[in-house]
Amino acid sequence: MKIVLISVGFVLALESSPVLAQGQVSMERGLQVAIVGGCHSCHTEGYSEAKGKIDPAKAMKGSSVGFRGPWGTTYATNLRQIARLLKEDGFVIMMKHMQTDPPMPWYNVQAMDESDIRSLYQYIMSLGEPGEPVPQQVPPDQEPKTPYIQFAPPQMPKG
């Protein structure tokens, strides 16, 4: 009888454990996904310079600092604006099917569990006003008007 009670107690303790909360969808989990997934590194201006401290006013609003390479100059999207254009199901579909230019690792996003994407959506929607759009992508043969990071050396072959 003691073994059964101890086993039941152990199972009940595990059920409330964060380890088993992996499939649950929540805003808090979305924050964790954004941190561990590296979303803030590009989509939150100043995040890296602040050594990982999230400025709520800037969180997930994208960046006006571009990434320049053979593909042109790309900018981290304002995810608050994107999320507000879509319902949660639409956000999941977009994230599972998108293909973007570098340096966005869209292939990593496509590998994410659906509950992670739904949690990310809930986190983004909790952040407040969407803010301004980021600059448009600049073709490779044009000079960007914003600061940018030279992401690939100019001597790299195109393609």
What are these regions (language model features)?
Residues 88-96, 114, 118-121:
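An amphipathic alpha-helix signature
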Residues 4-14:
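Sec-dependent N-terminal signal peptides
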